[in-house]
A protein has these predicted regions:
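ER/Golgi luminal nucleotide-sugar-dependent glycosyltransferases, focusing on the catalytic module
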Residues: 1-254
């Protein structure tokens, strides 16, 4: 099959040259800067020519940013504005605070031509960094399995780790199934947190973005598809993360 990928780099304030300075023009063409929060001043590299402002999309809903869905809200907007991804075979979600290393995009394309069902990730974290009990993981996965009508096996994430921080690229059908789930169930997920269902808030004050991160990670490792690590660095320490103040699941893992 002919592979057509795009990495959407989600940012509310900046995307610097250093994030993409090692990429060729052909690789840069596989990136789109996706900006949120209209009122926040932006510092965006000119190296990435493609840009989407979420607030200008035909369908847009600021509630997803207001409720701290962040990059997961962008997933919903990519799903509902289908023209944005209709020609793609694979969808990537990145933060602004990454560094694409040399050949990091082309290597993904080369791998996908051999196995288009591969899921690419930046980091797999162990259960000790979940801030959830095994019971709570199982209940979240039961909820997802019912709503998505597909098995999400919490024991896989518990035993082998979970793909974290959203940083990933997946086949479009994998992406769309999760984005559809968020679109249809985000209010109930908020209710799970608000009402401390299954005592899910007892370990730390989880925020929407953190729970969605974990649910995305549980879902991906349950797909029984090949997993391969991206050659992309998460450059967390070079940035101030103001949205992580009053920490929820914005736990900085060492």
């Amino acid at each position: 099959m002919e592979v057509n990928i795009n990495f959407f780099l989600i940012t509310y304030n900046m995307l610097l040259d250093k994030a993409v300075q090692h990429l060729t023009p052909e690789e840069l063409d596989k990136l789109t800067c996706y900006t949120v929060q209209k009122k926040v001043p932006k510092q965006i590299t000119t190296k990435v020519a493609k840009r989407i402002n979420e607030w200008e999309l035909p369908w847009n809903d600021y509630f997803y940013q207001k409720s701290q869905c962040y990059e997961y809200g962008a997933m919903v907007h990519l799903y509902t504005n289908k023209e944005l991804i209709e020609k793609l075979t694979h969808v990537g979600i990145m933060h602004y605070d990454v560094i694409f290393n040399t050949n990091s995009v082309q290597s993904v394309i080369s791998e996908l031509t051999k196995n288009p069902d591969t899921i690419f990730y930046q980091m797999i974290r162990p259960k000790e960094q979940l801030s959830l009990s095994k019971y709570e993981v199982s209940k979240l996965c039961e909820f997802m399995s019912e709503k998505m009508e597909t098995e999400v096996d919490g024991s896989i994430a518990w035993d082998n780790g979970w793909i974290s921080e959203a940083l990933s690229l997946t086949p479009k059908y994998v992406f769309e199934k999760y984005a559809k789930f968020l679109y249809e169930n985000h209010l109930e997920i908020l209710d799970i947190l608000k009402n401390n269902r299954w005592n899910i808030m007892n370990h730390c004050p989880h925020r929407m973005c953190g729970i969605l991160e974990r649910m995305w990670g549980f879902y991906l490792v349950s797909r029984n598809l090949p997993l391969k690590q991206l050659d992309i660095t998460h450059d967390w320490d070079s940035y101030q993360h103001k949205h992580m103040d009053s920490n929820g699941t914005g736990i900085k893992f060492l």
